[in-house]
C-alpha cells in the first residue's frame, strides 16, 4: 500500500518584515489584537508566522499593552 504524500503548507512570512516595521508599538492595539486568541492568549510563532525577532518584540508589546490596560489579560 502506497502512502499518500502530505500536502506541504506554504511557509508564512513575517508581516512585520514585509511591512518593514522595526519596532512593534504597544499602543497599536489594532495590530496587536491580530496576534491574540479569542481567549486572550498570545499566538505562537508557528501559527502567527512571525520571525523570532518580531515574535519576541510582539510578546513584550502585548504584555506592555496589558499592563497599560490597552488590552485585556483575559476575555470573559
From Swiss-Prot:
Q: Provide the leader sequence positions.
A: none
Q: How does it assemble?
A: Part of the 30S ribosomal subunit. Forms a tight heterodimer with protein bS6.
State the Gene Ontology BP annotations. Answer: translation
**Family to which the UniProt record says this protein belongs:** Belongs to the bacterial ribosomal protein bS18 family.
The record's section on Gene3D superfamilies has: Ribosomal protein S18 (4.10.640.10)
Question: What is the protein's name according to its record?
Answer: Small ribosomal subunit protein bS18
Q: Where are the transmembrane segments?
A: none
Q: Which GO terms describe its cellular component?
A: cytosolic small ribosomal subunit
Q: Does the keyword field hold rRNA-binding?
A: yes
* Domain of life, per lineage: Bacteria
Gene expressing this chain: rpsR
UniProt keyword annotations, A-Z = Ribonucleoprotein, Ribosomal protein, RNA-binding, rRNA-binding
PANTHER family in alphabetical order: 30S RIBOSOMAL PROTEIN S18, SMALL RIBOSOMAL SUBUNIT PROTEIN BS18M
GO molecular function: any one? small ribosomal subunit rRNA binding
Could you list the residue ranges forming a coiled coil in this record?
A: none
Biological function: Binds as a heterodimer with protein bS6 to the central domain of the 16S rRNA, where it helps stabilize the platform of the 30S subunit.
